[in-house]
């Protein structure tokens, strides 16, 4: 099994430099407006343009609309899209067809039985990301340093 480190919440050139120096494989850009690490599509474009190998750029989205996906694709080139919402397996397959970009699906884990959800996404995503399931604030899905 391969473990890849993704540092998410990149908002600046300094963040990118630090992620590379620390050996991250992926860097994540949060496009969810409710997040304190949110960046807009214009900022994503500038940061993704300077993201260099071996780093892979990841656009983190929460339940994206088709319109938003189209705007994302027109404004930036990202290596991966991470789906961090309540996207069904069917919706994930639609997103794969619309974007033709490799997908990462985040699965919230609170208890062992939550891991069973992984099977639903087999074959429709390139990676599964296990994250803590956060109860107290449904709008901030993960990435808060909470272990499970």
Give residue spans per PLM region:
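Conserved N-terminal beta1-alpha1 strand-loop-helix module at the mouth
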Residues: 1-148
């Amino acid at each position: 099994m391969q473990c890849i480190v993704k540092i998410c919440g990149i908002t600046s050139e300094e963040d990118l430099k630090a992620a590379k120096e620390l050996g991250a494989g992926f860097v994540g850009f949060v496009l969810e407006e409710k997040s304190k690490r949110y960046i807009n599509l214009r900022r994503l474009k500038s940061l993704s343009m300077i993201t260099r190998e071996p780093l892979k750029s990841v656009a983190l989205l929460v339940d994206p609309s088709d319109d938003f996906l189209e705007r994302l694709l027109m404004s930036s080139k990202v290596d991966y899209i991470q789906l961090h919402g309540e996207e069904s397996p069917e919706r994930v397959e639609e997103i794969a067809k619309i974007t033709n970009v490799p997908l990462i699906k985040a699965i919230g884990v609170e208890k062992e039985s939550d891991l069973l959800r992984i099977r639903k996404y087999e074959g429709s995503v390139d990676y599964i990301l296990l994250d803590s399931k956060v109860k107290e604030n449904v709008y901030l899905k993960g990435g808060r340093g909470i272990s499970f």
